[in-house]
């Protein structure tokens, strides 16, 4: 089934996600995996891009996240927009100290049901697709080399979709940017994707430091 966004060019019904329009676009576009004919990919969608894959092509996939609109129970949540999240995806609360990774077992419209309870999530929170990794003696690990399992984002985006695109063919390419000024409080990206230490009051995209986020 195609993914259709209402008012795809604007976020929150009134604001564009870039400080200057039109935003600078990369030369040529990216073939995006995991999308279908008829899907609408909004401006501001985060991408994990590869400028030269094993076939010598420019390819990308969508980094998944969403904002919680309402909480029905510890397993049922309404999102502001389901975006490209799918059944089977694992998500966690952005910014949580010890995040719980939960699997999406059901989707109805913008309402998701989790296969296990997640008491950390509430209205206004950002959820991001995640995975577990083992660390030893590094960040998140106790002293010594005892392995610990931590939850981290599945993807760190390095491009942002430059303009809204509707997929008319499966081989269609998507315009993206690696150099832009984006509006942080419009896109609501997870903090795990951002570097907040470079400029006071603004941040950079971890995967691409030429994309600057400002509050407006």
Residue ranges and their predicted role:
Residues 1-216:
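Surface-exposed, low-hydrophobicity beta-strand/loop segments enriched in small/polar/acidic residues
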């Amino acid at each position: 089934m195609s993914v259709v966004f209402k008012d795809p060019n604007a976020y929150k019904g009134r604001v564009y996600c870039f400080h200057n329009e039109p935003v600078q676009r990369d030369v040529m576009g990216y073939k995006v995996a995991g999308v279908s004919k008829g899907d609408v990919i909004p401006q501001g969608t985060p991408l994990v891009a590869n400028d030269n894959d094993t076939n010598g092509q420019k390819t990308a996939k969508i980094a998944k996240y969403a904002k919680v609109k309402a909480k029905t129970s510890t397993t049922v949540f309404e999102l502001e927009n389901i975006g490209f999240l799918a059944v089977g995806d694992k998500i966690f609360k952005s910014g949580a100290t010890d995040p719980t990774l939960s699997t999406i077992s059901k989707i109805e419209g913008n309402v998701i049901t989790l296969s296990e309870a997640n008491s950390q999530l509430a209205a206004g929170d950002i959820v991001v697709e995640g995975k577990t990794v083992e660390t030893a003696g590094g960040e998140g690990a106790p002293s010594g080399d005892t392995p610990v399992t931590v939850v981290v984002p599945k993807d760190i985006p390095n491009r942002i979709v430059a303009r809204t695109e509707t997929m008319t063919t499966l081989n269609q390419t998507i315009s993206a940017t690696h150099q832009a000024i984006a509006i942080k409080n419009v896109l609501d990206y997870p903090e795990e994707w951002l570097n907040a230490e470079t400029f006071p009051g603004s941040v950079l995209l971890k995967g691409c430091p030429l994309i600057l986020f400002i509050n407006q």
